[in-house]
């Protein structure tokens, strides 16, 4: 087992990474008699809910659970309210622990519930997808979507710990594995050139779920994110760099309808648009743009815009992005592979040109 610590100004919490952690009662530091509400969905529940309940009950915990509908389109206030109803009907108090057992949607909604219920209860994240293991479960971002924009209603709320059992990836559909690799590649592109080179050498092993490669990959991603969050917990500075490709990607998700493209798929194409724009601005070389495109393609990820979207469809969605300040579009771009920056008020004509470069042509 590996342990990565997230060091915040006032406290720290561990990220445990290993194989078989869910069935080990020692993974859960909850006192005997402690109340627990597990938030999950039917897809994850069929594989892992009984395992987690059994381990918790061996510790003497009193365990309830609530099932949310599965999918990005259910990352809503309605799903949030299902959690609140279950907590209230079960007479859960401020001393309860909410466990988010699932992917990014479950982690975001359950995390927001933990931040909100009785003004805050303890949260443990147990991410079961590659994307949530390397990204969304770490750092305390919680949110639900609005029909006009992704992640528009939420809070920063840190978990007390994150438990990453790599065995959960064995039941993950290949498409979900590939989507998670988009966030993995992002880390190398923005902050760690050596890791990007490692990915070029080992991406095929990750696609094949090689255990050793996965453990190294997940721990490196978590360490990179932990370091960024420690410097900038609430995204006032460097943490914005973690959003490479996300402004373009969120536009795709919102325009197509949540869930039609997976988040990682949208981020993959968004990263190519950001790289194309970076090259237009004279930053990254065309050779490095090609390296990024080839790596994403080897991970079976899209690198061009959906054929149902026109370049002009992007900007209205992008202007609702949370990074927009005083009506000015702010984008994460690349100086080079391994070095990102935030560009302020990029000309819309250049943005459209970059999107057009990533548009499908027959």
Curated annotation (Swiss-Prot):
Binding site for Zn(2+): 183, 246, 263
Catalytic activity: 7-phospho-2-dehydro-3-deoxy-D-arabino-heptonate = 3-dehydroquinate + phosphate
Details of cofactor binding: Binds 1 divalent metal cation per subunit. Can use either Co(2+) or Zn(2+).
Keywords carried by this UniProt record: Amino-acid biosynthesis, Aromatic amino acid biosynthesis, Cobalt, Cytoplasm, Lyase, Metal-binding, NAD, Nucleotide-binding, Zinc
Gene Ontology molecular functions: 3-dehydroquinate synthase activity; metal ion binding; nucleotide binding
Principal location class: cytoplasm
GO biological process: amino acid biosynthetic process; aromatic amino acid family biosynthetic process; chorismate biosynthetic process
Associated pathway: Metabolic intermediate biosynthesis; chorismate biosynthesis; chorismate from D-erythrose 4-phosphate and phosphoenolpyruvate: step 2/7
InterPro entries: Dehydroquinate_synthase, DHQ_synth_AroB, DHQ_synth_fam, DHQS/DOIS_N, DHQS_C
Cofactor needs: Co(2+); Zn(2+); NAD(+)
CDD domains xrefs: DHQS
Family from the record: Belongs to the sugar phosphate cyclases superfamily. Dehydroquinate synthase family.
HAMAP family found in the cross-reference section: DHQ_synthase
Family matches, as NCBIfam families: aroB
Protein name: 3-dehydroquinate synthase
Gene: aroB
């Amino acid at each position: 087992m590996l342990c990565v610590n997230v060091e915040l100004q006032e406290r720290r919490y561990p990220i445990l990474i290993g194989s078989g952690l869910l069935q080990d009662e020692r993974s859960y530091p909850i006192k005997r008699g402690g109340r627990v509400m597990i938030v999950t969905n039917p897809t994850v529940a069929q594989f892992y809910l009984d395992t987690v309940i059994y381990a918790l009950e061996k510790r003497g915990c009193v365990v309830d659970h609530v099932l949310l509908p599965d999918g990005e389109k259910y990352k809503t206030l309605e799903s949030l309210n299902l959690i609140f109803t279950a907590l209230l009907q079960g007479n859960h108090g401020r001393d309860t622990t909410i466990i988010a057992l699932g992917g990014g949607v479950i982690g975001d909604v359950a995390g927001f519930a933990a931040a909100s219920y009785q003004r805050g209860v303890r949260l443990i994240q147990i991410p079961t997808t590659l994307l949530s293991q390397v990204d969304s479960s770490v750092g305390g971002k919680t949110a639900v979507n609005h029909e006009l924009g992704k992640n528009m209603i939420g809070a920063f709320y840190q978990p007390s710990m994150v438990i990453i059992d790599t065995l959960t990836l064995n039941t993950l559909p290949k498409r979900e594995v590939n989507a998670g690799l988009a966030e993995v590649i992002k880390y190398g592109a923005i902050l760690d050139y050596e890791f990007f080179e490692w990915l070029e050498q080992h991406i095929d092993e990750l696609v094949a779920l090689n255990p050793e490669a996965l453990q190294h990959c997940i721990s490196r991603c978590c360490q990179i994110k932990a370091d960024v969050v420690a410097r900038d917990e609430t995204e006032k500075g460097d943490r914005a760099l973690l959003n490479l490709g996300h402004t373009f990607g969120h536009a795709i998700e919102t325009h197509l309808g949540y869930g039609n493209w997976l988040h990682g798929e949208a981020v993959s194409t968004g990263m190519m648009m950001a790289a194309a724009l970076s090259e237009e601005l004279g930053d990254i070389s065309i050779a490095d743009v090609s390296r990024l495109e080839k790596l994403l393609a080897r991970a079976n990820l899209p690198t061009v815009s959906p054929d149902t979207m026109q370049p002009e469809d992007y900007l209205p969605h992008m202007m609702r992005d949370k990074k927009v300040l005083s009506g000015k579009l702010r984008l994460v771009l690349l100086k080079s592979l391994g070095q990102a920056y935030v560009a302020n008020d990029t000309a819309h004509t250049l943005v459209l040109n970059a999107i057009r470069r990533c548009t499908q042509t027959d």
